C-alpha cells in the first residue's frame, strides 16, 4: 500500500480499489485514476464496461449510486470524482494532490468544483471519445461560452500560480486531473485554443499516466453509440 498518511484516522491499509467505466468514454473515471497514478498511490482497478449487459447491477455491487467512479477504501465507499480526490488528499497529504500554498489551494479547489458542476454544453456536444479521429464539430453558443470560460481558467491559474511547472498550479494537482478529460475533448474535436492553452494541453498529454490511459482506451472493444457523435461520417479508430 502506498503511503501511511491515514494512520491517525483509523483507516485500514487494505489495497485501495477504484471502480471505473470504459477508458475511452468515462471522463469521470479518468479523473481519480489519473490523479492516483501521478501521485504514486497504489490501487487495484475494477473496470466495468458501461451499457454492456447488466452493467448497472455490476456497478451497484460496488457503488451505492450505480455510477462510476467509486473508490473502495477498506469498509469505506467514496463516490463522485471530486469527493474521491478530496478523500485521497486527506489520506495521502504528502502526495501533493492540492497545492501547498493556501491561496493556490483555494483557487485549485474552486476551479475543480466549477469543473465538477458546470460546462454541461461541452459535455453534451463534445463527449469524451479518445478513439474518435480528430475532427471538429460546430460549437453552439453555449458550448463556445464554456470553452471561453475553460480557457480563461487555465490562463488565470497559469499566470497567477503556474511558475513552478507546466500545470495549472505549477506541479500537477487534482485540478489538472479534473480538467484532463477537457483536454481530450478539445483535442478530439479540434477546438481552437491559444498558444498557452496548447502548451498546457501538451503537458497533460505528455504525462506517462495519461499516455497509459489513452493506450488502454484505444484497445477497448466496446462502442457506446451515444458517444459516437457524427457516426458513421467520422469513423471510430480501430
Residue ranges and their predicted role:
Residues 16-19, 70, 168, 185-186, ...:
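A short, structure-level motif marking secondary-structure boundaries and short turns
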Residues 8-140:
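GST-like domain detector, emphasizing the conserved glutathione-binding G-site
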Residues 50-52, 200, 218:
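Conserved beta-strand edge residues that scaffold enzyme active sites
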Residues 61, 206, 215:
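Phosphate-coordinating loops and pocket residues in cytosolic domains that bind phosphorylated ligands
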Residues 217-238:
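Acidic/histidine-enriched, glycine/proline-rich intrinsically disordered or flexible terminal extensions
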Residues 119-211:
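GST-like fold's C-terminal all-alpha helical module
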Amino acid at each position: 500500500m502506498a503511503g501511511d498518511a491515514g494512520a491517525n484516522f483509523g483507516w485500514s491499509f487494505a489495497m485501495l480499489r477504484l471502480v471505473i467505466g470504459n477508458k475511452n468514454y468515462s471522463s469521470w473515471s479518468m479523473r481519480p485514476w489519473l490523479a492516483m497514478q501521478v501521485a504514486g498511490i497504489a490501487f487495484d482497478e475494477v473496470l466495468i464496461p458501461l451499457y454492456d449487459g447488466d452493467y448497472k447491477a455490476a456497478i451497484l455491487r460496488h457503488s451505492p449510486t450505480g455510477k462510476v467512479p467509486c473508490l473502495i477504501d477498506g469498509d469505506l465507499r467514496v463516490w463522485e470524482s471530486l469527493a474521491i480526490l478530496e478523500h485521497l488528499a486527506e489520506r495521502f497529504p504528502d502526495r501533493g494532490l492540492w497545492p501547498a500554498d493556501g491561496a493556490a489551494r483555494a483557487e485549485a479547489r474552486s476551479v475543480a468544483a466549477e469543473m465538477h458542476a458546470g460546462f454541461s454544453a461541452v459535455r453534451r456536444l463534445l463527449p469524451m471519445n479518445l478513439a474518435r479521429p480528430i475532427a471538429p464539430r460546430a460549437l453552439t453558443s453555449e458550448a463556445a461560452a464554456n470553452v471561453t470560460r475553460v480557457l480563461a481558467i487555465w490562463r488565470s491559474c497559469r499566470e497567477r500560480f503556474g511558475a513552478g511547472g507546466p500545470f495549472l498550479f505549477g506541479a500537477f494537482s487534482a485540478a489538472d486531473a479534473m480538467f484532463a478529460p477537457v483536454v481530450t475533448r478539445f483535442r478530439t474535436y479540434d477546438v481552437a485554443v491559444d498558444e498557452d492553452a496548447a502548451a498546457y494541453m501538451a503537458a497533460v498529454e505528455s504525462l506517462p499516466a495519461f499516455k497509459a490511459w489513452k493506450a488502454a482506451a484505444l484497445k477497448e472493444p466496446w462502442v457506446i453509440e451515444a458517444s459516437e457523435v457524427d457516426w458513421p461520417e467520422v469513423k471510430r479508430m480501430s
